[in-house]
C-alpha cells in the first residue's frame, strides 16, 4: 500500500482538479491569531463550504450523536486536499467514511467531568467553576472553525466549547458578583474585538456562527463594566457600540414604509422596528441533518426559506419556541423573519440609550441628542405596535399579517427590564406573568407545551433575571420575589441532588433539569451560575450574604433596582 503522504504528493494537482470539478468552493485566507482587527480581515468560511460534499456526507451518515462534533472538527491539512482525497476514494471498494474522518480530522475532545469538592455551598461551587469554564484561544489551528480571541473568556459548559454572545452577559453578572472584574473586562474586550473584526458580534466564535448575531446585550456589558470603571468604559467602547448599532440598522435610510432589509423593518406608519435575521439560507452546520429533515417535512415551503427561519431563530437565542411558529407542533411552520420581537426591540432601545449616555460622556452633545431621539421613537413604536391591548401584555408584531400576536411569553418582561414600559402597562404585565407563567420552580418561557426547549415547562436563568429586575424597576416587588425565590429554590434542589447547575430547568416543579430541543441537557452552566449569584444577593442583605438558598423565604428583596423608570415612561 502506498503511504498516504506519498500518494498525496504525487497526485496533488490531479486531486485539486477533481475537488474543484464537482463543487464550487470559496476560500478565504485568514489569520489564525487574534491580531489587529483594524486590518482588512476576510471572512473565513464555515466547514460546510470548505468541505462541500464531504461535510454533507459525514453529517448525513450520522457518524456522531451530536452534529456539532464534526462542525467543530479540525482538518489535519488543507481542506481542499482532504476533499480531493475523498472524491478519489469514496467509491472504492471497502471505503470506510469513519476511518477517513479519523485520519483526516482532529475531533473535539470531551471535556473532563468536573467533580466538585464535597460539602461545597452553592456559592462556593459556582466560584470554583469559573476557572474550569475559562478558555484562552489567542491562537487556533489554521483550518479550525474556532475563531481566535485576544483575551480569555468563560464558556457556558457542556457541548458549548466557545463563547456565546447573549449567554455571556449573564455569566459576566456572576463574574462581577464574584469580584472577577478582570474577566469582565477581558470579555468586553473580546466582544469589542469581534465587532471591529466582523462588523458585529457573531452568535459564537465559530466560523459557522458568523452569518448571524444574537440578542444585542453588548450595551449592557459596557454599562456593567462602567459600574466598575466609570464613564471611561463608555467612552472606550463608544466606537464599537456605534458599529453594533449600524449592523442592526443597516439599510434603514433607504427603506420605504412596508419594506424590510435584513434586520430592520419599516412599518406602514413609518415606525422602525427590528427582527432577527441570518445572512445564509442553508442548513446549520451544527444541526445539519435536523434542519434538512425539518425542511423535508413541509414540502409546501421552499427549503431555503425554512433554513433561514431556523437560523434566525438561533439568532434570537430562542431556538426553538412556539413563539416563532404557526403550528407549535410543527417546527417547519417556523417564520422567525416575519416577526418583530418585543425583546429584540427593547434591547435596541437600551442600545440607543447607552449610545446617548456614551456620547454625552465623550462630550458629543449633538450625538447624545440624536440617539435619545432614536430611543424615544423606538419607545413609541414599542408602545404602539408591541402592546396587545386586548390581552394586556407586550407581544411580538406579525409582519406577515400586520398585527400584534396574542401569545404571552417571558419576552413580555423586556420592556420593563429596559424601562421602556408605561407604568400602568407594567402592572398589567406583572399580573399576566403571575397568572399565566409563574410556576412552582420559576417563570415558564411560554405556556405552550410543544416539545421545544424554549416553551413550557422550561424556565431559563436569563429570563428569570430579566423578569425579576424588570418587575423591581416598576415596584412590582412581590412578583419579583416570587420569581426569584422559586427559581433559586429550583436551582438549589437540583444542586443538592446532582451537585451541578444546568442550562435550563423544568419549572413545573423544583429540582428538575429542563428537556426538549435538539441536544441533551447541558451542565456547567455559565448563565445559570451568574443569575444564581445575583439572585442570592437579591434575597440576602449585604451585611449578611448567603452562600446557599435560605430554608425560609425572606420577607422582601434586599437589593434596590439598578434603574428607575424614565420620565417618559411614568
From Swiss-Prot:
Example GO biological process: trehalose catabolic process
Q: Name one Pfam family in it.
A: Trehalase
- Which superkingdom, per the lineage? Bacteria
Q: Does the keyword Signal apply?
A: yes
Annotated substrate binding sites: 159, 166-167, 203, 212-214, 284-286, 317, 518
Q: Which residues form a coiled coil?
A: none
Its cellular-component GO annotations read:
periplasmic space
Q: Where is the composition biased (Low complexity)?
A: 554-570
Catalysed reactions, semicolon-separated: alpha,alpha-trehalose + H2O = alpha-D-glucose + beta-D-glucose
Q: Does the keyword Hydrolase apply?
A: yes
PROSITE patterns (UniProt xref): TREHALASE_1, TREHALASE_2
Give the range the annotation lists for the signal sequence: 1-34
Q: Recorded E.C. number(s)? A: 3.2.1.28
Per its record, what are the GO molecular function terms? alpha,alpha-trehalase activity
Localisation: Periplasm
What does UniProt list as catalytic?
319, 503
UniProt-listed Gene3D superfamilies? 1.50.10.10
> Keywords assigned by UniProt?
Glycosidase, Hydrolase, Periplasm, Signal
- Region of interest called Disordered, as start-end residue ranges on this chain: 544-570
**What the protein does?**
Provides the cells with the ability to utilize trehalose at high osmolarity by splitting it into glucose molecules that can subsequently be taken up by the phosphotransferase-mediated uptake system.
Question: Subunit notes for this chain?
Answer: Monomer.
As for family, the record states: Belongs to the glycosyl hydrolase 37 family.
Protein name per its UniProtKB record? Periplasmic trehalase
The gene name on file is: treA
